[in-house]
């Protein structure tokens, strides 16, 4: 189109960038003087600049790009390439901008005497670039597509056009407007690189004139201009092609770079071009753009912007987070961009609607169309977000031409303004919202002079490489455009236009034409929104515009914002398949009874211990129970208080035969809570079995406790239940502080079971029952089996908590059907995979109760079970288990990890609607409240009519068939979600303001917990707020409490302990931490702000029951360390802490079991951990029992004997000739000694290469081990595990190493004083055997790093460097024992080699206590000693505290040796002249002087220059822990001192 004028406030198009960073001490320095504005020839030099200059706001150069350019210059290359770095996009805003492409063309232009190429050509004037130009220039350099900011237009010209005269007019335009002949370059004036604009003396517009024979050529030329790369350093920023088809048919193709012109400038350009061409008039020079940029810089320097900056700081003081993507986005999160791929959709708004928009704006708001469009967009964005945010920030573009003179200037003036909006108030009309928006924007426009990038720096806006700062959606409003223009006697008509692309998510462009029409376009990033998404936004915007012109006074919330077509389509997607058969008229117990008659001998239910009931037996016992229940009077409710067992199933089926209502209770819940349930449902009876008789009697009250029958009745009992009767009542957490009972009918249950069977094509399933009985999944599993002719397998309580045992049970029973939460499945598949792989019948894994974990997908696929299908189910208890389901793994599943895991389409006979706040349907892709209709909707809440009425509402969208069947109610879930285009549901979470959450599948009302805390505190807690921290298995409840003013601080621990003990809540509902706060945060409506609550800081109150807790012992510190690895948050732990009270749960207990095994090598049964949740009790499980304690009874002969493969290697071994250059195998390279040893090896001239084996941490790289590039070239890492039989090396690698290596240094080991020998055998002894065999086969030296601790086995005062084979260790000293065994193994091999006459250098190195530096010596080593090293810690904290522990009775002799000395000694031995002596050589790396504790203290005092305080050991350790000493180290140190008082230690001797 042709742009002619802009009559409003000139809101124009814009360019926005994202952020990153880069810096370096090398910068471009551009020569030239600001005192000589003319005839300047800037020249490029490379120099060093103070690193501090990088933090200057004017610095526009990226260091890494400069390094590349420097390298290119040295190599004689004139151009550089910017490295792909997604982070560097922030450089502009820092302004640390990258410099690649722009300078390279100039470097090849003109040779010079000094070899430094000059830029061309000379300039008339030079001035700093504007802020907007800097923004464009940086992006031009940074983005990979240099055509991003090209603007291209094509016109058809009818009439006798004179191409040469038109070309002359273009050149005249360049004379009039300096911006059309401006070059852009960097100059380091004032020592900092800055972007300058140089005004060239002549036009640089590239004009071509062609005669063409086809309109196809027009398209080709247009594409060429569109894709042209403009040369900014040479001022070549515009390209024109004049094409003649016939004397009266012409085409004009015009292109330019956005840095030279903005949209308003294009209007000025066209107007001036018309005048010059039509009249031949020579127009005088227009006002200069460079004067504007100079004024802009001066305004910033003179603080002219201060008032406006203060305004923006005030208005944007509480910025909202970046706007979420709309739900219909193609991706779940934004990504950093280095190119913009933008597409768009457009629609013309006819004169009729356009006139109404103008009239409405004027009459209703006294304003213009622009403000009405902006208000409509504002409301649309809130609706599309589903009101997920109450605050948003939108951008508008401003022409930046407040000065009248600027209306004549061609240049880059456009600016962008951020506008923060709040959601409309309840009941607020559009009229009022329009007035509010107009006032807000008009005020903002008075402060529009501040450049966008100055505003960002001043506000210190947090940058991200993935989204635009401040706003992600912009409204670009244009006025006065026309499709046609006059060129002399010719008419020019717009054919097409390609605008510059932006990095914004979305740009809404509104163009107002002089003929009264409007054109509305929505432009967006292709990777974010598809064309359908853009079209939906556009359609919705037009709909709201139509609405407000008809009903401007209507409340905003009542405005219809989506078109009827999209709503109708959404309703169609919301409804599942409708199927109604004769079975829907039956109850599930009828379906069960039918199979009992047909196949009475089939197994119906069985326990893990082998007990089972056939269908006939189960029917008989159930009917006997039904008979007994029929004899009783009272309500139909029957409470079942049984452990999961055969009795439980007999109870459920018997209750249903009797036509009664099943009410399950979890016997592990507090008795007070169970009593509340009994009082609410007033049961006819409470069923129990032997294990629960006392509980049942205690709960009974007026009810009758009935034992479950152990035998069946002789005659049949007729089924009393019908589809309209209540099948069960499940109690869930309630907001009033009491649990609420959900009433589910037999019709609801039948609907669910049949829908599941149809959707998942279920047959005769073997179903695992492992859910809690009070969970709806429990009922689902029972009748998935019994109503489908299958078998139910009951997992006992102890197996339910152990994923390995559970998986084993599944494999034994050949389970086909499971129902669990994501967290439960994660543990099952991670820890029980080997057993699950044997469960070849496994067909259906249903996942529900919490968000599906995408990490489960590869885990399930790795099981390689071809028949297995994994399903994601969604649905609350109130709709009978589930309403939607999606196959995730299987033939028709997603089968890949993805950010978006849908819940699937509605099940048969269910409807899943997404409704807005007015309970109206929204289109697919728009979030709203999930509301469920159909045959599974429950009957309401027991004894709670008000809550029932608010949550179970009339379904006005129900089909006629649904209404006829009585399915005319809708359950409002309070969950947020949206529908995909295929009708699949995506669950987003809870609606704003909801206090309901899910904790590992269990529904929790936070209000209930808060009420219980206040009620239980005996008045000491005035108010409480509870929130969830973490996700899935890591989710914990955190409580924040406001205390009565007179509550003493020192009583907080006892208060919290009291609350933890007495809260009448199930364990999963008890907070794991309590924090005292002065007040709780509330939102503007006065409600508790849970989002703000979760961000409150504060130290959790320790839960103590002892005012003077004893320090933790060694085992307790080990356990505390394990707890901290698995517990979320920062729990305060003591010996009396309970794992479940500080954030633990049964799923984390599984993780804890593995961590304990990793730390100690001891496997503790889950049942033991579960039954002893206290810290002290759990720690006692780590103490070795006498019956299992490892002693010298270990068969050391067998342990250290030579294996057949090792003997074979010895038989064929021969000495390999030494080489001047050696390749070395090294283990333990990442450890304290290993790192130093590695550095010395790499630096040694004889070492050709170092092969580091068994690098366990996959994140370790060559760069992390050495910063020297020459050393890195000599280094190869092999990630693996010492415990692996071949150190994780494959045969090919072993063979390759065998042919290359000349030396083996085995320094690696698993260092743990907690683990027994049997645990350390594999990593410490088997690894020695493998490497020893490799050395013998190759015939090369073998050096083994043992420990000086083995000499203590001798019991002698001193011990020389000789064998200790005659002093076998106790097996419980695992680390020492493993080193002794390796020494003995090496000795046996050396003796066997000697018998064959083969001499291989075999050396055992025994280092004493290795330290970074010895006491009394200056300096430090580059390596840091292990954090858990006892002696190092003792010395380190003695230095820090200038305090020493009292050591009476401790006969320690401190033998410290520096790490550098040990490494040098090993290297000297390995690379020095070989010892000709036979057998194993022993080397002691120790200090000649052994220090007593007194001597050590004196050394440290002399080193520090002061006297150290001496305190008893317990006090010293307490202080050290406060200074940071690890608790386990502290406890071990105390334990060592206590156990070793009076013990005589063996000193290491240096000579034999």
From Swiss-Prot:
Disruption phenotype: Abolishes the production of acurin A.
Keyword annotations from UniProtKB, A to Z: Ligase, Multifunctional enzyme, Phosphopantetheine, Phosphoprotein
In-chain residues carrying the UniProt-annotated modification O-(pantetheine 4'-phosphoryl)serine: 1146
Pathway where it operates: Secondary metabolite biosynthesis
Pfam families per the UniProt record, alphabetical: AMP-binding, Condensation, NAD_binding_4, PP-binding
A GO cellular component annotation in the UniProt record: enterobactin synthetase complex
Annotated spans, Condensation: 129-564
Gene Ontology terms: biological process: amino acid activation for nonribosomal peptide biosynthetic process; enterobactin biosynthetic process
SUPFAM superfamilies: Acetyl-CoA synthetase-like, ACP-like, CoA-dependent acyltransferases, NAD(P)-binding Rossmann-fold domains
Keyword Phosphoprotein part of the UniProt annotation: yes
SMART domains xrefs: PKS_PP
Region feature (Thiolester reductase (R) domain): 1226-1464
GO molecular function: 2,3-dihydroxybenzoate-serine ligase activity; phosphopantetheine binding
Domain spans labelled Carrier: 1110-1186
Top-level taxon in the UniProt lineage: Eukaryota
EC id: 6.3.2.-
Induction: Expression is positively regulated by the acurin A cluster-specific transcription regulator acrR.
Chain intervals for the UniProt region annotation (Adenylation): 594-999
Top EC group: ligase
InterPro entries: AA_adenyl_dom, ACP-like_sf, AMP-bd_C_sf, AMP-binding_CS, AMP-dep_synth/lig_dom, ANL_N_sf, CAT-like_dom_sf, Condensatn
Gene3D superfamilies the record matches: 3.30.300.30, ACP-like (1.10.1200.10), Chloramphenicol acetyltransferase-like domain (3.30.559.10), N-terminal domain of ligase-like (3.40.50.12780), NAD(P)-binding Rossmann-like Domain (3.40.50.720), Nonribosomal peptide synthetase, condensation domain (3.30.559.30)
Function: Nonribosomal peptide synthetase; part of the cluster that mediates the biosynthesis of acurin A, a highly reduced polyketide coupled to a serine via a peptide bond. The activities of the highly reducing polyketide synthase acrA and the nonribosomal peptide synthetase acrB are collectively responsible for the synthesis of the acurin A core structure with a heptaketide backbone produced by acrA covalently fused to a L-serine by acrB. After the formation of the PK-NRP hybrid product, it is detached from acrB by reductive release to set up the formation of the lactam ring by aldol condensation.
Record remark: domains: NRP synthetases are composed of discrete domains (adenylation (A), thiolation (T) or peptidyl carrier protein (PCP) and condensation (C) domains) which when grouped together are referred to as a single module. Each module is responsible for the recognition (via the A domain) and incorporation of a single amino acid into the growing peptide product. Thus, an NRP synthetase is generally composed of one or more modules and can terminate in a thioesterase domain (TE) that releases the newly synthesized peptide from the enzyme.
Family: Belongs to the NRP synthetase family.
Protein's name according to its UniProt entry: Nonribosomal peptide synthetase acrB
Organism: Aspergillus aculeatus (strain ATCC 16872 / CBS 172.66 / WB 5094)
């Amino acid at each position: 189109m042709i742009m002619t004028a802009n009559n409003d406030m000139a809101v124009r198009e814009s360019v926005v960038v994202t952020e990153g960073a880069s810096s370096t001490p090398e910068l471009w320095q551009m020569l030239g003087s600001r005192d000589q504005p003319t005839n300047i020839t800037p020249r490029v030099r490379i120099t060093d600049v103070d690193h501090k200059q990088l933090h200057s706001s004017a610095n526009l150069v990226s260091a890494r790009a400069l390094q590349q350019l420097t390298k290119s210059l040295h190599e004689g290359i004139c151009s550089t390439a910017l490295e792909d770095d997604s982070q560097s996009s922030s450089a502009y805003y820092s302004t640390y901008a990258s410099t690649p492409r722009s300078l390279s063309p100039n470097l090849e232009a003109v040779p010079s005497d000094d070899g430094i190429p000059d830029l061309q050509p000379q300039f008339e004037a030079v001035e700093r670039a504007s802020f907007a130009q800097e923004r464009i220039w940086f992006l031009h350099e940074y983005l990979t597509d240099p055509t991003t900011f090209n603007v291209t237009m094509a016109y058809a010209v009818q009439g006798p056009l004179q191409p040469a005269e038109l070309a002359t007019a273009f050149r005249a335009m360049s004379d009039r407007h300096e911006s059309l002949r401006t070059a852009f370059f960097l100059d380091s004036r004032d020592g900092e690189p800055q972007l300058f604009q140089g005004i060239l003396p002549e036009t640089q517009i590239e004009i071509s004139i062609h005669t063409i024979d086809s309109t196809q050529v027009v398209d080709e030329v247009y594409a060429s201009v569109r894709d042209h790369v403009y040369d900014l350093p040479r001022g070549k920023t515009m390209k024109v092609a004049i094409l003649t088809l016939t004397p009266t048919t012409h085409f004009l193709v015009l292109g330019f770079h956005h840095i030279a012109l903005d949209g308003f400038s294009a209007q000025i350009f066209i107007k001036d071009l018309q005048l010059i061409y039509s009249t031949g008039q020579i127009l005088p020079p227009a006002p200069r753009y460079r004067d504007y940029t100079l004024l802009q810089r001066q305004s910033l320097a003179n603080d002219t912007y201060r008032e406006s900056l203060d305004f923006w700081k005030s208005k944007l003081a509480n910025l909202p987070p970046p706007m979420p993507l709309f739900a219909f986005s193609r991706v779940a999160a934004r990504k950093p961009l280095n190119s913009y791929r933008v597409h768009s959709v457009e629609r013309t708004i006819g004169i009729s609607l356009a006139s109404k928009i103008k009239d409405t704006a004027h009459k209703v708001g006294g304003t213009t169309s622009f403000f009405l469009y902006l208000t409509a967009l504002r409301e649309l964005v809130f609706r599309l977000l589903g009101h997920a945010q109450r605050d948003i920030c939108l951008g508008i573009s401003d022409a930046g031409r407040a000065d009248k003179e600027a209306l004549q200037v061609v240049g880059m003036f456009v600016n962008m303004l951020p506008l923060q909006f709040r959601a409309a108030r309840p009941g607020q009309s559009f009229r009022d919202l329009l007035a509010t928006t107009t006032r807000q924007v008009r005020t903002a426009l008075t402060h529009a002079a501040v450049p966008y990038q100055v505003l960002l720096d001043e506000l210190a806006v947090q940058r991200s490489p993935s989204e635009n700062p401040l706003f992600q959606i912009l409204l670009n409003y244009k006025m006065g455009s026309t499709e046609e223009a006059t060129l002399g006697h010719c008419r020019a008509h717009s054919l097409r236009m390609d605008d510059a692309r932006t990095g914004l998510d979305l740009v809404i462009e509104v163009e107002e034409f002089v003929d009264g029409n409007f054109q509305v376009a929505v432009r967006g990033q292709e990777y974010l929104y598809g064309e359908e998404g853009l079209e939906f936004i556009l359609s919705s915007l037009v709909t709201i515009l139509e609405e407000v012109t008809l009903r401007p006074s209507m409340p905003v919330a009542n405005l219809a914002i989506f078109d009827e077509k999209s709503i109708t389509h959404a309703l169609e997607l919301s409804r599942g398949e409708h199927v109604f058969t004769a079975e829907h008229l039956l109850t599930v117990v009828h379906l069960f009874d039918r199979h009992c008659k047909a196949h009475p001998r089939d197994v119906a239910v069985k326990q893990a211990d082998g007990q089972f009931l056939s269908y006939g037996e189960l029917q008989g016992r159930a009917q006997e129970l039904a008979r007994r229940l029929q004899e009783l009077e009272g309500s139909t409710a029957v409470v079942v208080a049984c452990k999961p067992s055969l009795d439980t199933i007999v109870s459920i089926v018997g209750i249903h035969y009797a036509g009664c209502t099943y009410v399950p209770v979890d016997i592990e819940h507090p008795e007070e809570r169970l009593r509340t349930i009994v009082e609410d449902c007033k049961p006819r009876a409470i069923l129990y079995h032997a294990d629960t008789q006392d509980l049942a009697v205690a709960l009974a009250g007026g009810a009758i406790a009935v034992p479950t029958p152990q035998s069946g009745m002789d005659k049949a009992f007729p089924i009393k239940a019908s589809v309209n009767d209540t099948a069960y009542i499940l109690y869930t957490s309630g907001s009033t502080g009491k649990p609420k009972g959900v009433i589910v009918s037999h019709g609801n249950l039948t609907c669910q079971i049949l829908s599941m069977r149809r959707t998942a094509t279920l047959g005769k399933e073997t179903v695992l029952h492992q859910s809690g009985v009070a969970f709806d999944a429990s009922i689902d599993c029972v009748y998935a089996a019994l109503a489908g002719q299958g078998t139910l397998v009951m997992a006992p309580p102890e197996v339910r908590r152990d994923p390995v045992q559970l998986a084993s049970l599944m494999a034994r029973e050949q389970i086909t059907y499971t129902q669990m939460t994501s967290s439960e499945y994660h543990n099952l598949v991670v820890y029980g995979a080997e057993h699950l792989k044997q469960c070849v019948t496994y067909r259906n894994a249903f996942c529900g109760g919490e968000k599906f974990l995408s990490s489960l997908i590869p885990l399930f696929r790795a099981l390689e079970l071809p028949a297995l299908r994994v399903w994601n189910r969604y649905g609350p208890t109130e709709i009978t288990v589930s309403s939607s389901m999606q196959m995730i793994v299987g033939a028709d599943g997603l089968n890949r990890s993805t950010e978006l895991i849908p819940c699937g389409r509605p099940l048969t006979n269910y409807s899943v609607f997404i409704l807005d706040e007015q309970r109206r349907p929204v289109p697919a892709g728009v979030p709203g409240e999930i509301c469920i209709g159909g045959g599974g909707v429950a009957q309401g809440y027991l004894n709670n009519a008000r809550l029932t009425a608010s949550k179970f509402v009339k379904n006005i969208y129900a089909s006629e068939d649904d209404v006829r069947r009585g399915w005319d109610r809708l359950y409002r879930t309070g969950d947020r979600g949206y529908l995909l285009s295929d009708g699949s549901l995506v669950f987003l979470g809870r609606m704003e303001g909801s206090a309901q959450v899910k904790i590992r599948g269990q529904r929790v009302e936070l209000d209930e917990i808060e009420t219980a805390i206040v009620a239980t505190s005996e008045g000491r807690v005035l108010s409480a707020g509870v929130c969830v921290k973490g996700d899935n298995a890591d989710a914990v409840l955190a409580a924040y409490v406001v205390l009565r003013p007179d509550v003493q601080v020192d009583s907080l621990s006892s208060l919290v302990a009291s609350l933890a003990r007495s809260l009448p809540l199930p364990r999963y509902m008890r907070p794991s931490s309590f924090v005292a706060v002065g007040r709780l945060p509330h939102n503007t409506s006065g409600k508790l702000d849970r989002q703000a609550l979760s961000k409150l800081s504060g130290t959790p109150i320790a839960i103590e029951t002892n005012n003077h807790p004893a320090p933790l012992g060694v085992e307790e510190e080990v356990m505390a360390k394990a707890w901290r690895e698995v517990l979320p948050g920062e729990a305060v732990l003591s010996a009396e802490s309970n794992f479940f009270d500080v954030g633990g749960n049964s799923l984390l207990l599984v993780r804890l079991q593995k961590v304990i095994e990793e730390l100690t090598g001891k496997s503790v049964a889950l049942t033991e951990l579960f039954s002893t949740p206290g810290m002290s009790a759990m720690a006692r499980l780590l103490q070795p029992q006498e019956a299992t304690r490892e002693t010298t009874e270990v068969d050391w002969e067998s342990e250290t004997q030579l294996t057949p493969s090792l003997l074979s290697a010895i038989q064929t071994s021969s000495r390999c000739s030494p080489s001047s250059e050696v390749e070395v195998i090294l283990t333990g390279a990442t450890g304290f000694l290993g790192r130093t040893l590695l550095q010395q090896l790499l630096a040694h001239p004889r070492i050709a290469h170092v092969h580091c084996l068994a690098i366990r941490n996959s994140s370790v790289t060559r760069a992390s081990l050495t910063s020297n590039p020459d050393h890195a070239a000599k280094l190869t890492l092999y990630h693996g595990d010492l415990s692996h039989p071949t150190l994780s090396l494959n045969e090919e690698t072993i063979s390759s190493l065998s042919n290359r290596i000349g030396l083996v240094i085995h320094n690696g080991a698993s260092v743990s004083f907690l683990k027994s020998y049997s645990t350390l055998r594999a990593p410490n002894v088997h690894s020695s055997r493998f490497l020893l065999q490799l050395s013998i086969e190759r015939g090369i030296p073998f050096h083994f790093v043992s420990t000086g601790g083995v000499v203590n086995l001798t019991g002698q005062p001193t011990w020389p460097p000789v064998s200790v084979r005659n002093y076998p260790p106790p097996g419980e000293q695992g680390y020492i024992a493993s080193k002794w065994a390796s020494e003995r193994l090496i000795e046996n091999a050396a003796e066997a080699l000697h018998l064959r006459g083969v001499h291989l250098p075999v050396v055992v190195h025994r280092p004493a206590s290795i330290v970074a530096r010895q006491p009394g010596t200056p300096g430090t080593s580059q390596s840091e000693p292990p954090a858990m090293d006892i002696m190092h810690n003792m010395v380190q904290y003695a230095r820090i505290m200038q305090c020493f522990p009292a050591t009476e009775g401790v006969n320690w002799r401190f033998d410290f040796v520096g790490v550098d000395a040990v490494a040098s000694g090993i290297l000297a031995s390995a690379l020095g002249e070989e010892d000709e002596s036979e057998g194993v050589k022993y080397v002691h790396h120790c200090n000649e002087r052994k220090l007593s504790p007194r001597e050590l203290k004196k050394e440290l005092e002399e080193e520090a220059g002061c006297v150290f305080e001496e305190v008893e050991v317990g006090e010293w350790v307490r202080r050290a822990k406060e200074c940071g000493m690890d608790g386990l180290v502290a406890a071990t140190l105390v334990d060592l001192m206590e156990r070793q008082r009076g013990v005589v230690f063996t000193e290491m001797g240096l000579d034999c």
